[in-house]
Amino acid sequence: MGLVALLLIFLFAAMFVAVSVVSLGAQVFFPEAFNGVAAGLATLIKEIIYSPTIALVGLMLILPLAAFVFLRSKLIPRWKPWIMLALLLFLSLSVSGINVVISYIGNFFTTSLAEKDPATFWRFMWVYAGVFIIASPIVVVYSYTRDKLALYWREWMTDSFLDRYFQNRAYYEVNSQKEIDNPDQRIAEDIKSFTSTSLDFLLLMLGAVIDVISFTGILWSISTSLSIGLIIYAVFGTVVMVILGKRLIVLNFNQLRKEADFRYGLVHIRDNAESIAFYRGEAQESVQVKHRFLEAVRNFNLLIGWQRNLEYFTRSYKYATYIIPSLFLASIYFAGEIRYGDIIQAEFAFRQVLEAFSLVVYKIESLSAFAAGINRLATFNEFLRDEKNAVELEVRTIDTVIGSQLMLEHVTLDTPKHQKTLIRDLSVAVQPGEGVLIVGQSGAGKSSLLRAIAGLWDSGTGRLVRPELGEMLFLPQRPYMILGSLRSQLLYPNSSSEVDEEKLHHVLASVNLADLPERLGGFEADLDWAEILSLGEQQRLAFARLLLTKPRYAILDEATSALDLDNEQHLYEQLQATKTTFVSVGHRVSLVKYHQQVLELLGDGSWRLVSTEEYRCSAKVFG
């Protein structure tokens, strides 16, 4: 914001220089027209030039330039947005200047009509035509530059949020934050609204300041009492709208959340359509999604009710502005102290200054929606600022150490926030090239232990030694199918790797998916893979990723649950041939033979670690 302020200071000074040059030039070459529009402007400019004030103007030009030169190394990478911001602010000043000129032209134009003075009428008609020719492209370029700068800002801000969203697995941790709902909407929609609306309000505020400075002088020169009445009227309207607008901010915030919840319900149905169809759960799904919609409708009814009440006030407030200037000026006009054109100019200036003073009144609905969006972005930004904010500070955490093998030493694993202890005092080492199978009843903590190994959970005590996560590959029960080509699916998460098609064909054949490229359009086919492939095909594709990636360690969470025994055996034999060390979670007895050790979680926090031979002989498991 400091650089923006310096830029504004520089532009104000530059605008003064430009106005001075144009005004003094116009007085020399077009004295009659210039003196008719702004007789005292050239005199005022000369007084400033020959006074100490000119030194201040010089400083306003030199100091911002020096600051920008000093910071040029930081600004060069983003020079386009800064150039566009400077152009936009300059155009904003120009538009305000044009409005001032038009107010004077309107004064003389209407006075000439009232006094039946054709010479003055046609002279200012030509002046207005010239201003129109100049103003039209300025206004068009102003609108284009504003939208373009908002787009640049959105691009930068979205990149920043996305970078932090994917750092330290914040996208995973955000699910535990109840106050941060629908992060997708905050990134996709709230940032877009924030950037465009913020820029609009910045320009509105700048225009308001310029209008107050410019038109208050005009208004004061015509009627002091009207100027004072204007200030009182504007303050009254602003106070009333601030009081009434507080409720509107809350309703807008709730509306954003409820609309996002409704949309999420529809997306959830789309993503789980097959499961819903199998369960014949249409009636229940319809009830829940309609409930979300009715919540949005109920809140919107409250919102439009408050908007209606505000509209009563804002309409009355606005309509009164058409009569107030005439009430103040009628007596002095009838007394012959001002011309008819002065009334027209005063009305124009009155509305310009009133709009500047009454931004809260006229923009209360936009401001309330904007405030709600800022609140949502602020909480999300606070969460992303530091990954430690993603979860509450833990009293006890598992100490994770990067080492050459996978080993747990006296690990006690709790659920997040320490609500429940899942495993107590676990010690196990996975020998290189071997496999460990984790078994146990549902809820015993099998998948939770994998989350701890992956660094997703750290609630508890003890010491976890593991390789870098880049040396490990996790295969969940339902593999993640990315949005991309078949090649990208196979190479994920290293989609930029260069692998020839012959090798890709070979790997697919090794997991019994040799026909996949020909059947679905080749390796560059971009399809909805989660919908097209069965769960069994997805699991085999995940094994193909493993064979291509060749990690030192593989963590498999029921990664073959949808496969028949022959395919399961084939894939585990392929895995064993790579000499990859692996940890599996599963329920099938058939998995035991592919591992050297079995870790059984007994469900009460206790556990036992046995060889596969001992586990096979266990009467507890096999009855």
Region annotations inferred by a language model:
Residues 1-10, 47-68, 75-98, 115-155, ...:
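Transmembrane-helix motif of ABC transporter permease domains
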Residues 38, 42, 179-180, 381-437, ...:
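Primarily ABC-family ATPase nucleotide-binding module
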Residues 90, 134, 138-139, 203-245, ...:
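A hydrophobic transmembrane-helix motif
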Residues 168-212, 271:
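Juxtamembrane loop-to-helix connectors within ABC transporter transmembrane domains
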Residues 251-304:
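Loop segments that connect adjacent transmembrane helices in multi-pass transporters
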Residues 258-262, 277-281, 287, 324-325, ...:
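Cytosolic ends of transmembrane helices, especially the final helix of ABC transmembrane type-1 domains
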Residues 471, 487-528, 572-573:
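ABC ATPase nucleotide-binding domain helical subdomain, centered on the C-loop/LSGGQ "ABC signature"
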Residues 489, 523-623:
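ABC-family ATPase nucleotide-binding domain "signature/switch" substructure
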